[in-house]
């Protein structure tokens, strides 16, 4: 297996106007705790944003996130780029709010990130409805903002299963207020278009649900959850390849075209945080498995308005990550180590790869990362991160 590595240095800058807040999305710079917004009789507009300029270096066959690909695989290369530039507008009035967020980068130009409304009932303060374009409610890392995430990028499995993290949809949110004994339990359940932020292109809708349980104590907090995804992918031809123990089984029937392959994921997540005399330690991880419809050359989920026009390949997958982070006491420094893995086809490995219709698309991918963050001031933090794959 080829070993690739890239060192990343970037600075995240934060600017907030017309309203007091610590960081985007209500996050403290080095915390993940969620706090309720106070109910106000007056409308409040908050504008926030951050930039992530990056310098990346990689070995010849590395895949960097900024700049053009390497034209000489025998030599290392480096690139400068603006990985992310988010500008967010959030307006809140009583128990309703609206959010619009755009992203500006050298790689994608200007794109829409979020555009949704959020309404909570004022009596029990427990039930809410969110509708528009927003993060899919699956696990922990998808919803963790880039401005506070310990690593520059999400685990490899998430952009494969959930490109762009967002989707069009409507979601029911159930979580009791903090003064209720039931606040330790939460539920998010919604119906989504299933193809990311591209135009909705069929009558089928996907279901995503996340049930979580967690609490906070003086020097310890925890959160655990389970997620489920039940969706569909359009079959563009009459040929469907289903992975078996001996390779892909091919079924060709003209009636298969226009039908829908099942897209089904299961996920489990947990996060533990400890505070000691040495600082704050975070241990977080997720495990996902299920069935992923794809093509011969990719196991990535659809994220465009165009319907697939190629054969459908059904693969059983699994993957996830484990992350350990530590904020060093009485210093502005944090350390992080992470292992993530994605096996797009659990029925093939080793010497069997390349037989039975399998190929590079079915190969297991893993990565180990180490990094350090310097929290110079609120809203400014250079990060150095090394990625080994």
Where are these regions (language model features)?
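Extended hydrophobic/Leu-rich segments
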Residues: 18, 22, 46-48, 387
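Cleavable N-terminal export/targeting peptides
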Residues: 1-31
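Outer membrane beta-barrel
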Residues: 34-64, 72-196, 201-208, 212-219, ...
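Outer-membrane beta-barrel pore domains
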Residues: 26-27, 60, 73-74, 116-119, ...
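N-terminal start-of-domain structural block
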Residues: 1-3, 185, 386
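Hydrophobic alpha-helical segments
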Residues: 8-9, 46, 282
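Hydrophobic alpha-helical membrane context
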Residues: 16-17, 96, 298
